[in-house]
Amino acid sequence: MSGVRPPIMNGPMHPRPLVALLDGRDCTVEMPILKDVATVAFCDAQSTQEIHEKVLNEAVGALMYHTITLTREDLEKFKALRIIVRIGSGFDNIDIKSAGDLGIAVCNVPAASVEETADSTLCHILNLYRRTTWLHQALREGTRVQSVEQIREVASGAARIRGETLGIIGLGRVGQAVALRAKAFGFNVLFYDPYLSDGIERALGLQRVSTLQDLLFHSDCVTLHCGLNEHNHHLINDFTVKQMRQGAFLVNTARGGLVDEKALAQALKEGRIRGAALDVHESEPFSFSQGPLKDAPNLICTPHAAWYSEQASIEMREEAAREIRRAITGRIPDSLKNCVNKDHLTAATHWASMDPAVVHPELNGAAYSRYPPGVVSVAPTGIPAAVEGIVPSAMSLSHGLPPVAHPPHAPSPGQTVKPEADRDHTTDQL
């Protein structure tokens, strides 16, 4: 079934539209951008079961990080939703095809944390080669290192970087940034990316290989920088690990599902992979006490934080809010800057031809209560509240708001839709 949803009504004659931050509670960055066109709610939820009914019924826009997942079943709970903006680049936690079917645009912020993710990737690579983490840990544990023999023992496995071959899987924004940094350290850099047109390897001075097998066979260190989809889940598995060079390193700052952690743990224990560094994991939040990696040696793990800096966080939140603003003040999807399901949305929906009064009877004389301007708290443990600005405590709204009627979804027009691309080069990490 295709969803038929109208444009977002905005202006003095219409109710102030509701926008919700689904899995967070800090709206201080978003408010200056949205306060004159929307009421901003924060839900602080980890699933749609924790999202207040008012948001499910009335929110036209949603902001979200990577800590909540929206399946088709989840998306169908939102009765008025027109746009979701992922505060970050990756959107594998959203069913974008189902969103398109339901008339919901999905956008991301692909560029804000490119530098941070690339820097973190190089940090992991350098850590594996120079064993900084393990040397620090040895001193913390009281190991006394004085003689040359003791240094050799505690630093065993440290290697020279110059002349080593770094293999990059996925040469999107982050992949390119990693390549440029790696060359400065003396790496020979090759990459595998079947979606890029010819010529970029010449522009960047890189070596391109035509198959994943070639990259794995020729790389001393493999680093992942591609989005996650149904085609590349467990791209690194027991079979592909065996195609890697004996004693190679593995780094993943992209998506946890790209690596089969059971296969990786076994390869680390057997020494087929000399060391690995992961910022993303199959199950998050990650814990060393659970899962197949708990006993794996020569492993560095960080908590999906490679993307973060204060500057990057502010930039991506500002851009996400601006995308929501474009949706409210403009036309979906034409006014959007980073809509990742635009083709599917355009083919599957015909909201532009609908009379808004038909789809939203409250705009045609039905009773409707307007939110006061500011931030609305609809956190799981709280009641709806609104304030003029942002303060720790919120003033309660009445629970007696009249219900808003929403029609059933219109039947599918039966058009042939263009399939989504298997991969978007803007989805490198976050």
Curated annotation (Swiss-Prot):
Enzyme class, broadest EC rank: oxidoreductase
Annotated compartments: Cytoplasm; Nucleus; Synapse, Synaptosome
Q: What is the effect of changing residue 55 to R?
A: Strongly reduces interaction with E1A
Region annotation Interaction with GLIS2 1: where it falls in the sequence: 1-59
Keyword flag Signal = no
- Name the active site residues: 255, 284, 304
The protein's matches in Gene3D superfamilies, at most eight in alphabetical order, are given as:
NAD(P)-binding Rossmann-like Domain
Q: Where is the composition biased (Basic and acidic residues)?
A: 419-430
Disordered: annotated segments: 398-430
Q: Name one GO biological process term.
A: negative regulation of DNA-templated transcription
Query: Altering residue 172 to E: what's the impact?
Result: Loss dimerization and of NAD binding
Cofactor-binding details, from the entry: Cofactor binding induces a conformational change.
Q: Does the keyword Kinase apply?
A: no
| Origin superkingdom | Eukaryota
Query: Which residues does the annotation say bind NAD(+)?
Result: 89, 169-174, 193, 226-232, 253-255, 279
The subunit field of the Swiss-Prot or TrEMBL record says: Homo- or heterodimer. Heterodimer with CTBP2. Interacts with ELK3 (via its PXDLS motif). Interacts with RBBP8 (via its PXDLS motif); the interaction is disrupted by binding to adenovirus E1A. Interacts with PNN, MECOM and ZFHX1B. Interacts with ZNF366 (via PXDLS motif). Interaction with SATB1 (non-acetylated form); the interaction stabilizes its attachment to DNA and promotes transcription repression. Interacts with PRDM16; the interaction represses white adipose tissue (WAT)-specific genes expression. Interacts with GLIS2, HIPK2, FOXP1, FOXP2, HDAC4, HDAC5, HDAC9, NRIP1 and WIZ.
Family, as annotated: Belongs to the D-isomer specific 2-hydroxyacid dehydrogenase family.
Q: Can you name this protein?
A: C-terminal-binding protein 1
Q: What organism is recorded for this protein? A: Rattus norvegicus (Rat)
What is the gene name?
Ctbp1
